[in-house]
Design a protein with these regions (language model features):
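Catalytic alpha/beta core of large soluble enzyme barrels
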Residues: 129-139
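Solvent-exposed, polar/charged alpha-helical surfaces in well-ordered, non-transmembrane soluble domains
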Residues: 31, 35-39, 59-66, 92, ...
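Short, low-complexity, Pro/Ser/Thr/Gly-rich segments in the mature regions of secreted, periplasmic
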Residues: 137, 141-152
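...with weaker cross-activation on analogous glycine-rich loops/strands in unrelated enzymes
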Residues: 22-25, 70-130
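Post-signal-peptide N-terminal segment of Sec-exported extracytoplasmic proteins
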Residues: 15, 23-58
Length: 153
């Protein structure tokens, strides 16, 4: 199944984030982050969007983290330089998954991990379906996943 993920190219830059440190927070904060992101389920895709009128992938992650008082860059490529890179085998709720979609040479898509069991699920924005939850077992995401970052430790 193809869900049509476009390269979330935002037109706005709200932060110039260069620090690669990660934020200390509790499990409760991670749950608040995921719950906030889930309030946008079903919202339509809009390039550069950061509210209920429409979101792109990095806009969704940006506003969810902002709600728990963590500032991230606005673009997925810049977000990929935040926190610390971890092994896919160490992924947990609240981590960020980064993808190179549409045969792009650089990271152009991001999702937030919502569940980790036998399957890793993440919330993100599809240009055709809006904000959805997908699985890393889906062939498209399995082949385009390139990096996992931990922001909250």
């Amino acid at each position: 199944m193809s869900v049509g993920v476009m390269s979330c190219k935002s037109t706005s830059r709200l932060h110039s984030y260069t620090d690669n440190s990660f934020t200390k927070a509790s499990y409760k904060t991670v749950i608040q982050l995921i719950d906030e992101a889930k309030t946008y389920l079903g919202i339509t895709y809009k390039a550069g969007g950061t509210d209920y009128r429409g979101l792109d992938c990095s806009g969704l992650v940006f506003i969810a983290f902002k709600k728990i008082n963590i500032s991230l860059p606005r673009k997925s490529i810049d977000m990929s330089k935040s926190g610390r890179i971890i092994s896919f085998n160490d992924v947990r709720k609240g981590d960020l998954l980064f993808f190179k979609t549409n045969n792009k040479l650089e990271i152009n898509h991001v999702g937030l991990v919502t569940d980790v069991d036998d399957d890793i699920k993440f919330i993100h924005t599809s240009n055709q379906l809006g904000v959805i939850i997908s699985s890393t077992k889906e062939a498209y995401y399995a082949k385009t996943l390139v990096q996992v970052n931990r922001i909250i430790d």
